[in-house]
């Protein structure tokens, strides 16, 4: 990923960095906690190379709905929540149906090792 791509990723809040990986910071999250959003973006860039097989290290500064890392196609998103002082691997799956926003659900798995 080039420096230009990294800058676009942070500034635009949403960017496809590969065929199957998406990073999203919603405008609402950015307005509510701009510092947290920027920290999250930096954390993501620092751990990008650790994304393997749909499993990734939790990123410090996460904690708002709308912040996603996706290792699946368009409608499969992986939200990762705050993990502090532990080696944490989050395997999270959120399935949203395009036909109806009413029918959507999320499944979260958190594995934290001291």
From Swiss-Prot:
UniProt subcellular location: Membrane
- Tell me where the transmembrane regions lie: 58-78, 94-114
Keyword Membrane among record annotations:
yes
Keywords in alphabetical order: Membrane, Transmembrane, Transmembrane helix
Q: Which top-rank group of organisms is this from?
A: Eukaryota
Q: Carries keyword Transmembrane?
A: yes
What membrane topology does the UniProt entry give? Multi-pass membrane protein
Provide the primary localization.
membrane
Write out the GO cellular component annotations: membrane
| Protein name, entry field | Uncharacterized protein YFR035C
């Amino acid at each position: 990923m080039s420096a230009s791509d990294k800058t676009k990723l942070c500034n635009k809040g949403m960017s496809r960095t590969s065929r199957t990986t998406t990073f999203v910071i919603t405008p609402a999250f950015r307005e509510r906690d701009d510092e947290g959003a920027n920290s999250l973006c930096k954390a993501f860039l620092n751990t990008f190379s650790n994304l393997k097989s749909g499993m990734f290290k939790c990123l410090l500064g996460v904690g708002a709905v709308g912040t996603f890392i996706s290792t699946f196609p368009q409608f499969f998103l992986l939200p990762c929540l705050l993990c502090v002082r532990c080696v944490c691997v989050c395997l999270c799956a959120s399935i949203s149906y395009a036909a109806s926003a009413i029918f959507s659900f999320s499944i979260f798995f958190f594995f934290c090792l001291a």
